[in-house]
Design a protein with these regions (language model features):
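Short, structured coil segments at secondary-structure junctions
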Residues: 62-64, 127
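Short, hinge-like loop/turn segments at secondary-structure boundaries
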Residues: 54-57, 87-88, 132
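Active-site neighborhoods of divalent-metal-dependent phosphate/nucleic-acid chemistry enzymes
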Residues: 68-119
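Acidic, PIN/NYN-like endoribonuclease modules and their adjacent C-terminal/linker elements
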Residues: 2, 107-132
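Histidine- and aromatic-rich ligand-binding microenvironments
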Residues: 5-6, 39, 99-100, 120
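Phosphate- and divalent-cation-binding pockets in alpha/beta enzyme and binding domains
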Residues: 45-46, 79, 126
Length: 132
């Protein structure tokens, strides 16, 4: 079963980040045999790194063995709905930290897969994570 790749890991590779680039690239290579996918949210978040050129972005993803056409399904919406409601409830009671809704969408999407490859494991508590 495939792994979902978080935006930060792909940006590490794209930007050849001095701190995280090599580890992120090696992590992707190590999980390639299981399959690598991104959520529609990550597809959108990557756009600025390619100046909005979808063709260049898709070439980068293809070179790195990452599928980008996996659809968002209603079950993802239902999971996201629950995750976001829980997040807001915790925040209102002072038990949660500020969290972008994009992370909730990525986590909801990742629940259908083996887990999430991310540098931010604390942001994704309901799915298995691999940190490069």
């Amino acid at each position: 079963m495939a792994w979902v790749v978080d935006t930060s890991v792909l940006l590490d590779v794209r930007m050849n980040d001095a701190t995280f680039g090599l580890a992120s690239a090696q992590c992707l290579a190590a999980h390639l045999r299981d399959g690598l996918v991104i959520s529609p949210v990550t597809y959108m978040e990557l756009a600025p790194a390619f100046d909005g050129d979808a063709r260049l972005q898709e070439q980068f993803l293809e070179r790195n063995g990452v599928a980008w056409l996996e659809p968002w399904i209603h079950a993802d919406t239902e999971r996201g709905h629950r995750l976001w409601a829980d997040q807001v409830k915790r925040k209102r009671t002072g038990q949660g930290s500020k969290r972008p809704v994009a992370d909730v969408f990525i986590e909801a999407f990742a629940k259908r897969f083996q887990g999430l490859i991310t540098r931010n494991p604390a942001d994704f508590k309901t799915v298995p994570v691999v940190v490069p």
